[in-house]
Amino acid sequence: AHEINNPVNFIHGNLSFANRYTHDLLELVHLYQKYYPKPDLEIQERAEKIDLEFLIEDLPIILSSMQVGTERISQI
């Protein structure tokens, strides 16, 4: 169990930072969208290519599920 818990604890400990950084970056993206609602074509194309709206919605969910997963593993 120690061989599993030790690396999982590293991941779990860093997820709180990843959540905070993600939240901050997504807030910044929202500010850009608010103040620059009509970006250049290159930015529009890139946003469509990476499906930015889905990414903004899904990334926090992914991080949350990773948090739950590491908590469950550490309870084993």
PLM feature spans:
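Histidine phosphotransfer helical core of two-component systems
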Residues: E3-Q75
